[in-house]
Structures are given as structure tokens and as C-alpha cells.
Amino acid sequence: LQAYVVQHENEGYVLVKDIEQKRGKVRAVALYNPSEQPCSFTVPLTDLEFEGTVKVRDLVKHRDLGKVDGALKQEVPAHGAMILRIEGKKRIEPTVYEAEWAYLPLFDDLGKNPNAVRYTPQEGTSGKMIVGYLGGQPENYAEWKEVYSEKGGQYRMTVQYTQGAGRQLELTVN
């Protein structure tokens, strides 16, 4: 599985992915700072899908950083990255699925089609990005393939989207 962005902190990014086992109790976390200034990260463990205390190891320096409760706090120098192994006792279900995490069959990052599906920065959104130019044809959709619920059942879902005049949102849940 590919890592995905779970948080933006100032100019930095927090990426996460399962390692060792899908939906397991060990995850890799990357704190990436592409900016010209140091970046202080404060990442709630719930954003990493953990509850309680976790053990943290710096995978680049091969060093244990101890136990963390509540939030992971690290400072990353300018143009730097920190790759961590996080191990917890209790993995929790995700509560947010960002547009940027969706599978987009017609995504085109080459820029050849001016109306192709694309990611666009937008302040005020939870992930600081939106997916634009969806729709117009049946194969131009967004699909979240890794939605997870341990027990299933009924859930309340909130969808936030922007639209132009005369457009609609169609939602299918299996």
C-alpha cells in the first residue's frame, strides 16, 4: 500500500502507511518538510489511527525515541524528512477519508488535457486540497477502495464538496 497524506503542518506533510500487516498495529510515518524553515509537527495519534500509547523508532538513525501518548511531536529541519516506525496496542477505525486518497481512473498528471481530473490546493479544506473536474462521463469518478469498518453497521456520513452551477453529486455505497 502506498503512503498517504494525513495532515499538513505549516508547509510540511505527514504521510502514513501500514507495514508488516494491513490494518496491523505497526505503521510507518514520514514527516516531510520541503520548506526553507524548520517545521514543528504535532500529530494527534488518532490521525494515525492509534489510541493510547505508542512506541516510536527513528528508522533512519536506528534509534528508539520512546513512548508517546496523545500526539507525536517532532521538529524537522528545512528540506528534511523523518521516517518513523510507530507501534501501538490499539488501532482505531479511520474517521476521515480525504478526496486525495480516492482512486481516480481518469487522473492525468501530465497536464495534456486542461479539463482532466486534478488536485488543486484550496485553503479551508481539511486536507488543503480538492479534486477537480470529476464527472462528465461514467468513467470519471472518485472511489475510495480502502474504506474500513471492523464491525460494519450503520454510520452517519458527511460529504463536503464544491460545485459549479447546474452540477450534482451522485453517491453510491455498497
Predicted regions and their residues:
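Extracytoplasmic
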Residues: 48-53, 63-66, 70-81, 85-174
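Buried hydrophobic-core signal for structured, non-transmembrane domains
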Residues: 29-31, 56, 157
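Short, glycine-/Ser/Thr-/acidic-enriched flexible segments
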Residues: 21, 34-37, 61, 89-90
